[in-house]
Amino acid sequence: MEFVFLGTGAGVPSKGRNVSAIALQLLEERGQTWLFDCGEATQHQILHTSVRPRRIEKIFITHLHGDHIFGLPGLLGSRSFQGGTTPLTVYGPKGIKQFIEVALSVSTTHVKYPLEIVEITEEGTVFEDNEFHVETKRLSHGIECFGYRIIEKDIQGALLVDKLLEMGVKPGPLFKRLKDGEVVELENGTILNGKDFIGPPQKGRVITILGDTRYCEASRELAQDADVLVHEATFAAEDEQQAYDYFHSTSKQAASIALQANAKRLILTHISSRYQGDTYKELLKEARELFSNTEIATDLKSFPVDR
């Protein structure tokens, strides 16, 4: 599992930062990539990374401001042009379906893969399978905006091979049956319960990715005990009132959410273009005064998510 930040700026592109898009690489977990937001030129940013459009399985949109969605039509079309055939699902607030369908229709763009668009109308679970569970809550922004909590389900423990070998059980079909938790009988009449030969499960990881938001309780709830919290930090602490007026957060407020939620790690993004060059490091300094395990994303930077 790895983050690739494709765009980390706020509002409009700047020389140093493109607008919002984050790829969550789940190559080891499911051989796919999930994308969170898709600002303009996202597909161009992808060209500079290991992200492959054909592997994008899901796109989660936080809200419908242009800096978070204007890259969608181009990416969806290019994925088809480049030979993508596997299904893709886009999740987002009400209106995302109309935006995509009109853009593709007017531009006569035809996608050759199954494209499903899911409009989120209620908080709660938006996706779940045997590996992951994705929950959402409304944040505090000028328009409807969602934050996402991605929960990796616990992974079954490894088969205790050494223990079986000590008992004289040879590798083969019995190993698979025992790993599946079956009760088996050996040739000598010994009964083995597969559950007794499975190590402890690996705890799944929790990732929280928030859209644009003021400091709010929903952010803390989504980030509770997260392994990684990705939070916007549009403004410095001295501009807290301006952040409030424009429905955004300061770096210090992001750190406060991480601290209250007992998150393990904080990554700041959505940085205003007023912080050019190394001036953005002041945002990092302010956040670390409150929450030491803070990093700030820059375009094309990757962050592995360890177990």
From Swiss-Prot:
Residues binding Zn(2+) 1: H63, H65, H141, D212
CDD domains: RNaseZ_ZiPD-like_MBL-fold (cd07717)
Active site as annotated: D67 (proton acceptor)
MF annotations from Gene Ontology: 3'-tRNA processing endoribonuclease activity; zinc ion binding
Positions annotated to bind Zn(2+) 2: D67, H68, D212, H270
InterPro entries: Metallo-B-lactamas, RibonucZ/Hydroxyglut_hydro, RNase_Z/BN
Reactions the enzyme catalyzes: Endonucleolytic cleavage of RNA, removing extra 3' nucleotides from tRNA precursor, generating 3' termini of tRNAs. A 3'-hydroxy group is left at the tRNA terminus and a 5'-phosphoryl group is left at the trailer molecule
Needed cofactors: Zn(2+)
Enzyme Commission number(s) of this protein: 3.1.26.11
One Pfam match: Lactamase_B_2
SUPFAM superfamilies found in the cross-reference section: Metallo-hydrolase/oxidoreductase (SSF56281)
Keywords assigned: Endonuclease, Hydrolase, Metal-binding, Nuclease, tRNA processing, Zinc
HAMAP family (UniProt xref): RNase_Z_BN
Subunit organization: Homodimer.
Function: Zinc phosphodiesterase, which displays some tRNA 3'-processing endonuclease activity. Probably involved in tRNA maturation, by removing a 3'-trailer from precursor tRNA.
Protein name (Swiss-Prot/TrEMBL): Ribonuclease Z
UniProt organism field: Bacillus cereus (strain ZK / E33L)
